């Protein structure tokens, strides 16, 4: 499917199509691109889909997008064999997993402290919009030519976006640590606030690729000594997180807070400071995730990151971190992120619709929590003892 999409995009560009938009992933990504065209007042000449799930979106276009009435529909030739177990599909899965995996590092730390952060998806969308808007405004201030903007403009915009997301994470952590408000309530409220701010940025309109410098896409698509930037960032952050969690006293403090907060406090652990730290880190990494996602599609939309918190939490719990706090490993989270990514890829190839995919991920979270709870109460040990033969 992705090979078809990329090949078709290249062919249309060589035929002189001035504006080709590529939507890869779940059907909701196709709706995002349609929203971009609508917001920018552009016309829809042709639309391509690689499966029935995308066709459902296309059938609804005349009703939901009255401005798009006449357009061609292109479909691929029937596949002779599955492309699921191919190197290209693995690369595509890795590309999509990077944002989930990086954001999940911060979520792992939060959950180990027996907390939760429901705002990460909205922070991804917020930081994507803020970063792209800042860069667009700098381009306008410099004369309005995106081609004349340098890398400093791009990376200063990314830095502003990450810093803003980190400050929001700091705010969430302060409410949890010092005001003793339940993490679920705090981050639910922050989720709504951040989504509202994302929708207000740039007047609620998409920041399109025509308004951004060419260097904007380099963060996600560029390479470092031959290694894709996304892979380099993934390896760097996971190694750093592993060392921090397993080799430093602050990592041990995080586990102590989640294991028994009162005991940790009596032992001299700065509980409030640790809670503040993990929520701030989670916000910063969500900000980086938003920059990576915007760079991947070379644009920023107000709906970016919608539902991402579900995938991030699923990656953490599938990776073995207990939602009840006190245990978990960052490399387990990385494995969990790839499991979720592979499942998403498989469901896309099987043409599962977005609601079905969300139901599957929700079920995975519930099952993982139930299994963890069974482990905590010693259910497996009791079952093994009951099933073992009694001594004569």
What are these regions (language model features)?
Residues 3-10, 16-104, 139-154:
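Membrane-interfacial amphipathic/re-entrant helices at transmembrane-helix boundaries
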Residues 141-190, 335-336:
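Alpha-helical transmembrane segments within multi-pass membrane transporters and channels
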Residues 240-280:
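Membrane-helix/interface signature in polytopic inner-membrane proteins
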Residues 110-127, 175-189, 253, 300-310, ...:
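Short, non-helical or kinked segments that cap or interrupt transmembrane helices
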Residues 279, 286, 296-362:
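Transmembrane alpha-helical segments in multi-pass inner-membrane proteins
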Residues 86-138, 174-181, 320-330, 363:
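Single transmembrane alpha-helix segments in multi-pass membrane proteins
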Residues 63, 266, 270-273, 347-392:
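Cytosolic-side transmembrane-helix boundaries in multi-pass membrane proteins
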Residues 155, 184-248, 274-277, 296-304, ...:
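Transmembrane helix-bundle core of multi-pass membrane transporters
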């Amino acid at each position: 499917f992705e090979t078809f999409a990329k090949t078709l995009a290249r062919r249309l560009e060589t035929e002189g199509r001035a504006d080709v938009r590529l939507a890869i992933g779940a059907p909701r990504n196709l709706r995002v691109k349609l929203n971009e065209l609508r917001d920018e007042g552009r016309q829809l000449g042709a639309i391509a889909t690689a499966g029935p799930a995308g066709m459902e979106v296309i059938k609804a276009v005349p009703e939901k997008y009255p401005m798009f009435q006449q357009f061609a529909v292109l479909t691929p030739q029937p596949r002779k064999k599955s492309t699921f177990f191919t190197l290209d599909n693995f690369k595509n899965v890795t590309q999509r997993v990077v944002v989930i995996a990086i954001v999940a590092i911060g979520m792992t730390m939060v959950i180990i402290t027996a907390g939760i952060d429901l705002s990460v998806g909205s922070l991804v969308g917020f930081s994507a919009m803020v970063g792209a808007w800042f860069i667009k405004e700098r381009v306008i201030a410099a004369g309005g030519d995106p081609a004349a903007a340098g890398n400093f403009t791009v990376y200063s915009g990314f830095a502003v976006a990450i810093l803003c997301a980190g400050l929001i994470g700091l705010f969430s952590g302060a409410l949890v640590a010092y005001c003793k408000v339940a993490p679920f309530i705090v981050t639910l409220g922050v989720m709504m606030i951040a989504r509202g701010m994302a929708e207000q940025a740039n007047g609620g309109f998409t920041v399109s690729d025509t308004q951004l410098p060419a260097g904007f896409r380099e963060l996600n698509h560029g390479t470092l000594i031959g290694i894709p930037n996304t892979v380099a960032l993934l390896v760097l952050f996971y190694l750093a997180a592993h060392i921090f969690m397993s080799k430093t006293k602050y990592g041990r403090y995080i586990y102590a807070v989640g294991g028994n907060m009162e005991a940790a406090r009596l032992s001299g652990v700065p509980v409030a400071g640790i809670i503040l730290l993990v929520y701030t880190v989670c916000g910063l990494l969500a900000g980086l995730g938003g920059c990576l996602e915007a760079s991947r599609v070379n644009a920023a939309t107000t709906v970016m990151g919608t539902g991402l918190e579900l995938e991030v939490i699923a990656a953490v719990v599938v990776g073995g971190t207990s939602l009840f706090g006190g245990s978990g490993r960052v490399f387990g989270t990385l494995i969990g992120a790839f499991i979720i990514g592979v499942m998403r890829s498989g469901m896309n190839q099987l043409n599962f619709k977005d609601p079905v995919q969300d139901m599957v991920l929700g079920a995975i979270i519930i099952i993982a929590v139930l299994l963890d709870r069974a482990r905590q109460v010693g259910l497996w040990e009791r079952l093994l003892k009951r099933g073992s033969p009694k001594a004569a």
